[in-house]
């Protein structure tokens, strides 16, 4: 399920921007249970993380919404991992012009991501929405890699359902992990900034009656205006109260910080250069007078000077 509101309606987001400031809520994640513990809930605000991705990659409107949804989805999945160093990798590879969507998120609340064609823009749908499904493509696969921190990651894949991201994540959870789930993802933006972004994941606990599945979906439908509500200043707790307040909602006190973060650094780039071999580095010194590398996940540019390359070659010669 995806936010069917102003998050994809450009006219409406402009109207909102004239009367209200963007959400000032810091990015965070909370957990809860409902229906006497039979439903587990994760909710998050990812506004600043998505805005940073938009700025770093110079994303178009539709690319911002697509990547923003995927970033929130990966964070929701990572929230249920057990070890702090555990991570989730999402890859959505459809037949649309956006190309692939790649996201890496950790149980620690860090997230990064990129799309293959960040500048792509498409006409709005007849309902004046950004056409994320058309941009991603309705034919292709969602790949989910889970690294639980034990050195043996495992991957599963399902066919895309709609390319809208939320539907595809729900289908993955129900078919691959066999956990009945309802997912709501939203990104609200205007020409200047991401006004609000986030998501909610509801899942049945083991042993819970199947009759709660339509109940979960109906409850999430109450907050289809999810991202505009965040843009207006509503908090996650208030939003969860709207859809689950009368169903024995219990919100955990822990609040986890969410942030865009990439592990790349100059030392890693130099390590990758060493893998090219001494002869290749000598050729770089002669022809390019240095080296340049760009991290795909965060678009950070690393420039390695000629002197630094010579130092690397000298180290390799001294320690063959």
UniProtKB/Swiss-Prot annotation:
Localisation: Cytoplasm
Cysteine disulfide partners in this protein: 262-264, 295-298
Region (Disordered): 1-27
Alphabetical GO biological process terms: protein refolding
GO molecular function: protein folding chaperone; unfolded protein binding
GO cellular component: cytoplasm
Family: Belongs to the HSP33 family.
Protein name stated in the entry: 33 kDa chaperonin
The species this protein was found in: Synechococcus sp. (strain JA-3-3Ab) (Cyanobacteria bacterium Yellowstone A-Prime)
